[in-house]
Design a protein with these regions (language model features):
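Surface-exposed, beta-sheet-biased, low-hydrophobicity segments with strongly acidic/polar composition
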Residues: 2-206
């Protein structure tokens, strides 16, 4: 090959670098144009009233978990968020995107909330208590978009077992406050949940 022709071609590393630059630029353009639309919610007010018995709740609660250093507590009996020192009897605690239970949680997989009929006892997982307390059953309730950089629920339903052996069925609807501020974790739940044919059948529903 003549020397003139050899030197007229751009070196391969230069072509590769240019292609990478084009790919990165295209990704950034697509990311900037991506639809940043997820459900947003306003935090639910805290509740203080104590209940002697647990009426059936089918509701949603939005927990203001924007403080990354403090757990926020939900009491299904009272149907809302409770604050210290009035947290005796809490069922679920939330800190940012972390969720734990007072007793245990079972991942029921992707399903419509209304389709939950049974809860296998073997599926329940207790919290792991360490420097960053967590529960493996619900740890990956979200999927993260590399394009929008937002957390979105996976659509799983979860069974939460309370200290007094009642059950709540829970589904996470969102993670963002109004204005797309992270930390407003919103739970849809039904409680107490009767499970025919298991030890978790709620008294009064047998």
């Amino acid at each position: 090959m003549p020397d003139g022709e050899r030197h007229s071609r751009p070196p391969f590393p230069l072509l590769g670098g240019f292609a990478l630059f084009i790919a990165v630029t295209a990704y950034l353009v697509i990311a900037s144009m991506a639809k940043r639309s997820v459900p947003t919610f306003d935090p639910s007010p805290q509740v203080t009233a104590s209940l002697d018995s647990a009426p059936r709740h089918d509701d949603t609660i939005t927990v203001d978990a924007t403080d990354s250093k403090r757990w926020q507590f939900v009491d299904f009996d009272r149907g809302g968020v409770v604050a210290p020192p009035d947290t005796v009897g809490w069922d679920v605690a939330v800190r940012r995107y972390h969720v734990i239970a007072s007793d245990a949680i079972a991942d029921l997989g992707v399903r419509r909330f209304e389709e939950v009929r049974d809860v296998p006892e073997s599926e329940f997982v207790v919290n792991v208590v360490d420097d960053d307390t967590s529960n493996a059953a619900i740890r990956r309730w979200y999927k993260y978009s590399m394009v929008t950089h937002l957390l979105e629920p996976t659509g799983h339903a979860y069974a939460v077992r309370t200290r007094d052996a009642r059950l709540a069925i829970v589904q996470i609807l969102g993670y963002y406050c109004t204005g797309l501020r992270p930390g407003c974790l919103t739970l849809r739940y039904t409680y107490p949940f009767p499970v025919p044919g298991t030890a978790h059948r709620v008294a009064g529903n047998q």
